[in-house]
Each structure stands twice: as structure tokens, then as C-alpha cells.
């Protein structure tokens, strides 16, 4: 009898343990936990895992696209599974896989994880995981294969080669292997080539917008083909959002014409849509991007350009490869002719950078901490008769706010020193051509006599500031201050 009771107890325990390790499914996505994670990975050769936090805005934006991708893969009977881990609950897993931010996505292939580097729309996710689990380019041996391939993928690139061993075909395969975010197909079938009216050694990008397809022209080499994929896979005029940001800033076109508009105000139809022909004409050199003033998330972008949302519709041009150089048209006219003239001047190198600047306050030198703006920066900071310590700050920066009372004390201490000036400049509203600020606060010391610029990298304490100034900036073994808050970074390219 005792044996029977023990056996029943063990059986019940086994069932309970199995139930705990069960994998729930939410909208096609497997719910991974500490209890079932190891088995889930072992049972599936390919698993994309999202580590998320319920409060994370980016995670919330990703959720419907992630579920859509999971469902579409399941419909295709794909062996690829999508899973998610609530990292705020499953802390052990988050620590094991070095999760430092949300969402973090890792792709497990036969148990080995690699970082996910694709986009955040369903089509991008499917393209990326498909590429990771198969050949660089899918072999399309019939018209039916090609039609199904294009049906399964919103954006797809097909190479048409009579000889798959040709140098052109090998170049195509190399590019297909290098670009994880794109889906490639290849065909040597005569019926397929005829169906799509392709030339031998031709490459066509199929897409659901604009002209529906783009035909590659020019010398077929790796550089040209990569640029073709990145440029032609985007709409002629791209709307900036969380999903498109990585494609906009990760592409090969580094000069962007930005349209600040209100969709609710009808600006797209009135001002943007008529510019598609111009966008097509300049698409190899300039990317056209719309930024909506209706989105709260875009407030920081407006601040970065020294604008407010009441100024829409308006345009700016930014050149990412040269320290985020910005350009502003002289006219408020948004006609196609005026905008094209503006672009021509830019491409001909005839435009001068637009630098933000505030008006100089009348009482800028009233207090111990002197106030600098673009117009008085050189006359104060580069005055060779004095050494000048300048804090470049942002009004919203938490570290800057913490520094303020210490910086005031420092200025009070040196207010009667004829050789040292303590100053500050709001770098969100004032820009300098010679100095680019990428994080806040940035503190620089402009030494008297030779104007040598020395970065202050000690702890931001009164004692360390005094030590630094008394040593005329020559302090050995300065250690950079480690910033811990994300808000202290100046706007990054992928935030614009």
C-alpha cells in the first residue's frame, strides 16, 4: 500500500513538473521562462528570442510586428520559432544572456546564440531569420517557385543568370550573403527569366510601393549592388519612425532632406507628394525623409534642429558624414522648383552650414558663471589673456542639473581671479563650427596664451575642479567620467 501511495505521489509530481515546463503560446509567440527555456532551445533548431520589459515603449511597438512574423512563419510551416522572455521576471535568463537593454533579440541556431541585427517590422524579421537558416539566395527553378517566393516576401531581390557559375552570379551571391536584412533569390531558368522580362546577369528588386520594381543598372560589383539594395528598398520619400530609423541611418545615402510636416494638417498631400519626381531624380545622392510634428516622440528631433512644431511645414538638410552638418533654406517657399534649387546648391558645395544660436542675454556676464552663445563664444573662450573653463550642457540633462550647484560654487571661488573665467553654453541652442558636442555635460578648458583645448575628465567635484584649474589643466592620469544615464547622450543618428 505504501509503495502504491509513493508511486502515485511520484507520478503526480512528474505531471506537475511537466506542466510547469510547458510552453505557452501568445499570438504565435512562445513564452519562454527559466523552467522551459533550456528544453525549448533544445527542441527547436532555430529560435529567435526577444528579451523585453512590459514597460518598455520600444518593446510595445515591436510586439504586434513580432507576433505577425511568428504567425506568418507558422503558416509557412517554417522550422523557425519566435519566443519572448519577460526579463523583469526571468532575471536569471536576462543575466545569463547579458541583456543590457530592451528589447534585446538573440537568434539561437542549434543552441548557439548570435545578436539579431535586422529591422523591427514583420517582413524584416522574417527576411533576417530566413537568411540565417538557409542559403544566401534561394534557387528558383520554376515560374511557380518565383511567384511563391515573391508572394512570401514583400521586398525581394532576384538575380537572373543563365550561368550560375559566372563571375556576375558569384558577386551576386557574395552580396546576398553579406546583407542579412534582405531576401535574395536566384534563377537560371529560361522561363523565369522570360516571365520577368529580365536580361542575362540582370538583377531586379521587387517591392510593394512606388514603381513596384527596380532594375539594377551599371557595373555589377559588390559596392554597387549593396547600394542598389539599400537605396531601392526604401520608398522614394520615407516616413521616419522607430521601424524605419535603422534603414534610414544605416543606409549608404548620408545626405538627407528632412520634411517637417503635420499629417493631420494635410502637409503630405500638399507639399510632399508633388516632390516624388525630384526624389527619384536625386535618390542616389539624397534621401527624402518626412518627420511628423504630430508624434510626441519627435520632440527631441525638433529641439536638435532648434525648431518648434509651430514652424511646420518646413525643411532642413543634414549631412551625417560630416559631424551632422545642417543646412537651412533661405526661403520658406516649398515649391518643387525652390527645393530643387536648394538641393543643387548643396550638391555643388555652395551652401553654408546652418548653426544654431541664441540671442546674447544683456546680463550674460552679471553672475560668476558667464553665459556663452554662438556669437560671443570666440571673444570670451578664445581670449588669450584668460583661461576659460566652459561647460557645454543641455537643459534636460540630469547630470548637468546635478553639476549646477557645484559649478556655481566653483565660479564663486574664482570670480575675483583675473586669469580664469568660468562659463557655460546651452549646446542644444548654440552650435560651433569648430567644436562638436556629442554628450552632456562636456567640459573643456581653453588655456590662456596658446588657446590649447583640454578636456576635463576628472570627477565632477569641487575639489577636482580646483585641482584641475590650479594645475592649468595639466593633470596627469585623468580618467573619463562614466555616464550611466541614457538621457545624457546628445541625439544619436538613429534617433533622428
From Swiss-Prot:
Disordered: region residues: 473-496
Catalytic residues of the enzyme: 56 (nucleophile), 59 (nucleophile), 397 (nucleophile), 400 (nucleophile)
A single Gene Ontology CC term: nuclear envelope
Tissue expression remark: Expressed in all head and body tissues.
Record site feature (Lowers pKa of C-terminal Cys of first active site), residues: 120
Role according to the record: Participates in the folding of proteins containing disulfide bonds.
Domain of life: Eukaryota
Keywords noted in UniProt: Disulfide bond, Endoplasmic reticulum, Isomerase, Redox-active center, Repeat, Signal
EC number(s) per entry: 5.3.4.1
Annotated GO biological process: protein folding; response to endoplasmic reticulum stress
Location in the cell: Endoplasmic reticulum lumen
Residue ranges, compositional bias (Acidic residues): 476-489
GO molecular function: protein disulfide isomerase activity
Reaction equations catalysed: Catalyzes the rearrangement of -S-S- bonds in proteins
The protein's name in its UniProt record: Protein disulfide-isomerase
Disulfide bonds: 56-59, 397-400
Organism: Drosophila melanogaster (Fruit fly)
